[in-house]
Amino acid sequence: MRNSDCKTRWRFGVLAALAVTLVAFAPQLYFSLSKGSHWNGAYAQTHGDESVYASYLNALIDGRPRRNNPYSGRDDSPEHPAAESYLSVQFLPPVLIATTARLVTVSSTKAFMALTVITAFASALAVFWLLASILKDSRLAAIGVLAVLLASSANLIAEYLFGLGAANNYLPFLRRYLPAASFPIMLIYCGLLLQMLTATSKRVASASVVSAGVLFAVLVFSYFYHWTFAVVWTVCLAGIWLAVRQHERKRVALLLLILAGFMIAAGAPYFVLISRLGATTGEAHFMAASHKPDLFRLTELFGVLIVALIGFMVSRGRVKASEPTVIFTLACAVTPFLLFNQQILTGKSLQPFHYEVFIGSYTTALAAFVAVILLWRGFTVTSPAVARILLTLVAGGAVLSGSAEATLMTRRQLPANQIRDDARPALLRLAQIARQTKDGSLDTKSVVYAPDFIVASSISTTAPQPVLWAPYLFVFPDVTLMEDKERLASFLYYKDVNFNNIDQFRLESLDNEQSYYLSSLIGRGRFNPRLSVNWQPIAADEVHLALDYYRNFVATFDRTQAARPLVSYLLLSADDPVKLSNFDRWYERDEGEHVGNYILFRVRLRS
């Protein structure tokens, strides 16, 4: 364990990256092979939010402007300028992916499949490079890759096994296109910053700080939770470094000033874009006012253990507090405390679980791995043979953990993915129709009504036509929360949904879909306690008000409401007919076009 190789042996990193990539792509591989010749080319959605990212990406591939709403069909134009959305502000990944997709003529579906492979492989190599530069041991770094990327979210398996809930974010770093696209960049930024601080050559230090500054700018326009994490982590790293390596203060301060210049240069235009966000953005994304401390998240608890372990080793003289590896580890361990408690000073909290799920768990796992290796090196408690066995067990356990997450991910999403794939031929037909307009323009006005919740979410991932309602319609600033609520009520009314005989004191008796609909009528995000630090359980009087709203909506529904928005297409499964007496009261259909397992009707409002 004491012997280290100063030269990075990339073959170990490549092997680890191949293992991670295989686990990452397994859900797609299984899905495609399980459908065999009946696979219609749909990507295997693995995380709940991927449909909104795929929809926005598909709109960009179609050549629509950066400020667009793929669900409503409303795009930015000189006549109707659109506000910024959280997707249009984080534009670098989708614009780059869309540009590449157009150049090589691939769809958003194929782009998502490719992104999984690219992200998994690149992230693994980034972790390997970072650990190899810290530990000076390529074999250990390769094992660390598996531990960090495949076991960081192992707690989700425990939650599943003990019946504490089924997570929606297994192997979360792979969620496309965010945080997947910026995840390896975040890791490389960390490595460059460490390289900047430890470089003995001015040329290397200068190159590192410039590279880190450029990557920070990329993060700023890629993913909010990554660039804000980078800022806090940089402050922690710089603060600890300056405190324990005082003899380097002048040199380090100069480098940090250069980095700060890059940060300010990137932040200035970013905050201009932020100032142009829609008025409902904060509410739509569950911005909460709170000064309440948040001290008991898993990453924070592990952070305490890591700091205690480092403190123990320093007190025993096994490591020095001034060692770069120790400083790096401490910075990773301390950062979550600042991130999860910044609201004590700012009074604002924005879905902080994203820090834990999409970056904090990985940097904490990385710090834990480094701390354990430092402990092992400082206290030679086992023979080299036993050490090799233990490390093999760590690697095997990590692969097993990642495989278990991939399996749970596949199992959870399989029914919905099958529906998406069955509907794909009809969605491709819609996309074809949208390009057959008289003036040659793309049809982004003809609204599609798909009563199936999953199909409604999937239409915009392939076709440019807007939809009556979809779960993520409300996150775009052109749609107010009231409009979203009305469109949801129309969506439910058309397919004859009623909430009769619902016990407002026993909502747990509802199935997941009904529960989602009802909670959304009460208020967006009320179904998920993780979305806001101020979340409160739904009260009986709120249920009563929502039911009254829906009953009144149904009772007063008229032709004016039926035309808001005007529906042009109806998409139904041929194998699972839905009662649509309310829809047929207001719209008349043509004979329908059979496309695969679906029927596409052209409809018009009755006179």
Residue ranges with predicted function:
Residues 466-570:
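Luminal/periplasmic acceptor-recognition loop/helix of membrane-associated glycosyltransferases
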Residues 49, 215-341, 345-352:
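Transmembrane catalytic cores of multi-pass membrane glycosyltransferases
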Residues 1-34, 390, 607:
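Start-transfer (signal-anchor) and selected internal transmembrane alpha helices
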Residues 57, 388-482:
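Extracytoplasmic
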Residues 228-233, 349-380:
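Hydrophobic/aromatic-rich transmembrane helices and adjacent perimembrane loops
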Residues 257-264, 375-406:
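Signature aromatic-anchored transmembrane alpha helix within multi-pass, membrane-resident enzymes
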Residues 22-185, 224-228, 407-417:
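Active-site lumenal/periplasmic loops and adjacent helix-entry segments of GT-C-fold
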Residues 190-192, 207-224:
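Membrane-interface alpha helices of multi-pass inner-membrane proteins
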